Structures are given as structure tokens and as C-alpha cells.
């Protein structure tokens, strides 16, 4: 009975590790959300031409957004980009 209990605990901890470790790698350390400011600019899959702003690791820069898809690192204004991504 002792071995079964140990194996059960090891299995539980292994599953817990496999489930939580990838989330820890992708999470923003401040609030648990994925840090969208670290994502690359992404035009998306559509062919429109909207001016948007993305954070490039140092500052906010313009890029052309296709109108659909893409990722969260797109903002309607430079001010919105800086507010979300610039570190004080």
C-alpha cells in the first residue's frame, strides 16, 4: 500500500508539472496574461491596409495591419501602445 501511494503522488505531480509548466513559460510575470508586447508585429491574413502600432521591444512603431487575424501586439494609436507596453 505504501508503494501505491508513492506512485500515485508521483503521477499526480508529474501531470501537474506537464500542465502548468508551459503556461509559466508563456505568461507575463506581472499578471498571468500572455505578454502581448513581446510578440512580433503580425499583418494578419486579410489584405486591407490599416495603420496600427506595435511594440518592438524598445518603443512603439507603425505597421500595416490587414484587418483580421494577427496577434495582440497591435494598437490603434502610439499612445495606446506606449500605455500598455512601455515600462516606466
Swiss-Prot record:
The record marks 47-48 as: Reactive bond for trypsin. SUPFAM superfamilies: BPTI-like (SSF57362). Pfam families: Kunitz_BPTI (PF00014). Gene3D superfamilies: Pancreatic trypsin inhibitor Kunitz domain. Residues 37-85 form the BPTI/Kunitz inhibitor domain. Disulfide bonds join 37-85, 46-68, 60-81. The keyword Flavoprotein does not apply. This is Kunitz-type kappaPI-theraphotoxin-Hs1e. It comes from Cyriopagopus schmidti (Chinese bird spider). The lineage of its organism: Eukaryota, Metazoa, Ecdysozoa, Arthropoda, Chelicerata.
